[in-house]
Amino acid sequence: MYQEISKLLMYGDLPQDEILYKLGQLFEQFEVGEYNKTELVRDINTQVKRILNVATDYGFDDNLWHNYLTFFLMMSENPFSITCEKVGASDGSVNGLVANDFRIFKKLFDYDFKPIESALGIDCFTQISNYKAIVKKDLMYNHNVSEKVRALSKKLEAAKDEQEFFDVVTGFYKAYGVGMFGLNKAFRIEEHLDGGFSFMPINNMDAVMLDDLIGYEIQKKKLTDNTEAFVQGKKANNVLLFGDSGTGKSTSIKAIVNQYYDDGLRMIEIYKHQFKYLSKIIAAIKNRNYRFIIYMDDLSFEEHEIEYKFLKAVIEGGVETKPDNILIYATSNRRHLIKETWNDRNDQDNSNDKHHSDTVEEKLSLVNRFGVTISYSKPSQKEFFNIVTELARKSGCTLSDEELCREANKWELSHGGISGRTATQFVNYIMANN
C-alpha cells in the first residue's frame, strides 16, 4: 500500500495526519517486517477508529473503506479537480499524469487486507468493509453529503478498470464540484486567532421548502424569479427581505438554497461583526463554479456602528468589479436597516460632524443598494387561521378547523401575537399534547 500511495502525483500532497498517509506508513512497517506486533495493531486500530469517526459524522454505511476513499477524492481540491469542476475532463497532458493516480485508487479500492489481518490476528478491515451503521436521525449528520458519498462509492466499486474509475470521478466533479463547496449547501465563517477565517459547513440546515411556507405567494415568486435568473447566469439583484418578526423571511432564504442547490447555489452566512472579511470572502469564492448567496440575517445597524461601510463598499464595488457569481441576500426587521434618531434629524446637535446630513444620507441610502426589496408583513387574522389549519393538516392533526382556530386565537394572545412563527409553535404544541 505504501509504495502505491507514494506514487500519487496530483492527489499525493497528503497531510501527515491524513488517515491514508498514516495507514501507508503502517503498512510499510508491515511489508518490510520492521514492527512490534502489539504496537502495530494498536496504531492500525487507531486509524480504523478514525475511519469510524468519519463514518459517524457523515452517515456512511456498508463498505467504510470505500466510503472513506470516495470522500477523500470528493474533497481533494487540486488543479485537476477544480478544472473538472468547471469544464469536465478535457483532453490534455494532465489527463496522462492523473491516469496513474486513478490506477492507484482503483488498486486501493480493490486492496486485499487478508494477509495483514491474518499475520496480525485482526479483522478490523473485514468488519468495516461490511458495516451496518446504527440508524440515526438525518439532523445528526449531513444527509446530503452521506447520500452523495455512498452513491459515488457504489459506482466506483462497479468500475471495471481505471478508465471507468476516472470517468466516474470526473463526471462527479463536473456535476457537483469538488471539496466542501461541492458537497455542502451552506457555510458559516469561523474566525481564527491570527485574524484569518475559514468556511465551516452547516451540517444541520433545515430541509424546508418554499411550499412549507404558507401564504406569501407574491413574496416567494419575487424571490424565486430573482434567484432563478441568478443560477441561470442572467442578471440578478441583491435582495433585502424586510418586515415583521416571525413572518418567514429567514425560512424563505433557506428554502431557496434547498431548491436551487442542485443548480449550483450555495449560501455563506455572515454576521455583522464579520463584515471586515467580506472582501477576502469574495476573493476566495469568485473563481469557483458555483453561485453564492452571502446571507445576512436580522441585519440592522445602531447609530454608533460603522460596519455598514464594509457592506456598502462591497455592494457598490470599487476598482474591482463585483463577481457575477455572488449576490447578497439580507433579512431585517427595519425597512431602512439603520435606526434613525432624533439627533439624526437635527444637524445642530452634531457639532462634531460638520457633514452630518451627508452621514445620515449615507446610512439611509444603504437600502437603495439592494435592487430587490420584499416586504413580509404580519398576516391578517384570517390568513393566520389559514396558516394554522394548513400546518395542522400537514402534521396529521385531527381537530376540526373551528377547534383549531379557537385554540390558536387563545395561543397567539399570550405568545407574541399573530405570525407564521406563532402558528408553527401552536401546531407543534397541539401535536405534542394530543
Give the predicted meaning of each segment:
Residues T373, S377-N434:
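C-terminal alpha-helical "lid" subdomain
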Residues M1-E157:
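Intrinsically disordered, low-complexity N-terminal extensions of AAA+/P-loop NTPases
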